[in-house]
Amino acid sequence: MTKNLNLRKVFFLALLMFCANLFAAGNGYTPQKREFRGAWIQCVNGQFIGMSTQKMQQTLAYQLDELQKDGVNAIFFQVRAECDALYKSDIEPWSRFLTGVQGKAPQPYWDPLQWMIEQCHKRGMELHAWLNPYRAKTKFTSTLDPKHVAMKHPSRVFPYDGLFILNPGLRENREYIIKVVDDIVERYDIDGIHMDDYFYPYPVAGLQIPDDREYAANSNGISNRDDWRRYNVNVFIKECGEAIHRLKPWVKFGVSPFGIYRNKRPGVEVGSLTKGTQNYDDLYADVLLWVNNGWVDYCVPQLYWQIGHSAADYKTLIEWWNRYASARPLYIGEDVERTAKFADLDNPNCNQMPAKFALHSQLPNVNGTVLWYAKAAVDNVGNYGTMLRNKYWRYPALQPRMPFIDSKAPKKPKKVKSVWTCDGYILFWTKPNAKHWDDEVYKFVVYRFEKGEKINLDDPTKIVTITDKEYHKLPYVDGKKRYTYVVTSLDRMSNESKAVKKKLKL
């Protein structure tokens, strides 16, 4: 019986890999040199509650190791789910999603955000601190710490369907959230600040947002209540991005909105052929305004539906976002479990992963993918992780450029040389000097080409590693085969320097 099960497992995996290769070839999938490959690691579902410090660190380290093997190069780590903190904060209380009790510090003490920054950077990954801006209490939180903003300033929150929401119509709430963001940006070496889809609450039939008083007092001359709500969120997004870049220009500010901007209907031309909740009309989030005005540095619409969904077809939506949200880098939020669950419409023996990745490759303004959620990829649901590491994300990828922040390439590496050491044959180089943050070298890219092969740095299959180290161990065999190694520098915005070549016999 066990033997038969193992044979079935092997056959199923082989079939999936065959489907991946078939679809990739048939739909024109090619590896990308620059691609954002992210994953969300959330706390809000309680996956860490009850874990000791050691157990949580082991769990996170294992997830990061597996995601690194899958080719992931960025992590969105949730550090603020309900005006709380998974980091040391003098502004907000420790999260119950960390210790089980809001306001209780972890024992033995540690700072999860600082630890994750170190662990991600060690693995060559970016770390984006993920915050929920307005939610002050989730449905299942029954007790708030006295330090919590809803306890200290109850008039600044409103209840809605079991939630507490920081009222977006109050300037002091906007300033408060930005104060929290500034504190993180100042004290931590993060690569980005990330905010998800929760702005005004998702609408519930029969419930009204209780903001009559705030609208009457602070309408700013806006006669339409919906426009006023959008104005409140717009001002927050604009001011938050400006505050981040004043402190650290290289810290990226991004959002992951709900997957539908607006449903197309008479009077709404810039809408998709969908029938669902809308950012603009229901959540009061004018995402296209933020993108087109440059108030955010990247956008990750959450396209969690399948191809062929009757109300929110994935193909329709990814093509819509590709068309309308190209003013800033566009990454697509993917639901791993749903993608693995649904069969491809044209090839029912395969799930929808190959078809979706083919769309990513074909659409010119799609610059990356973010996986919802990390653990699903780590658990290899539907062999999703296997397909990433063996096919789609097999080769390392640089981050997409952000020339609106910095477009100047750094200086190339210096003193590239190969040396025999007690640890083997090592390729060494040194970091060039820098006078300013946008000149500073942050990482290096190492390429390898065989003898006679054209040096083409646009070919990602030639990337050996992307590293912050100033050396690379060479795979010496017998010294009979000739290669050309190429080393380049990267700055914080992934601008790439000129190349330095070194011919070697391995």
Spans of model-derived segments:
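Pro/Thr/Ser/Gly-rich low-complexity, intrinsically disordered linker/stalk tracts
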Residues: 383-384, 388-439, 494-506
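Catalytic domains of carbohydrate-active enzymes, especially glycoside hydrolases
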Residues: 58-85, 187-190, 289, 295
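Active-site-adjacent "subsite" loops/lids of carbohydrate-active enzymes
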Residues: 34, 42, 46-58, 129, ...
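Aromatic- and acidic-residue-enriched segments that line the glycan-binding/catalytic groove
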Residues: 85-100, 135-160, 197-220, 265-277
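Aromatic-lined carbohydrate-binding/catalytic grooves of carbohydrate-active enzymes
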Residues: 71-107
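Active-site neighborhood of glycoside hydrolase catalytic domains
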Residues: 172-180, 186-195, 199-273, 277-303, ...
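Beta-strand-rich modules
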Residues: 473-497
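Substrate-binding cleft of secreted/luminal carbohydrate-active enzymes
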Residues: 284-310, 326-404
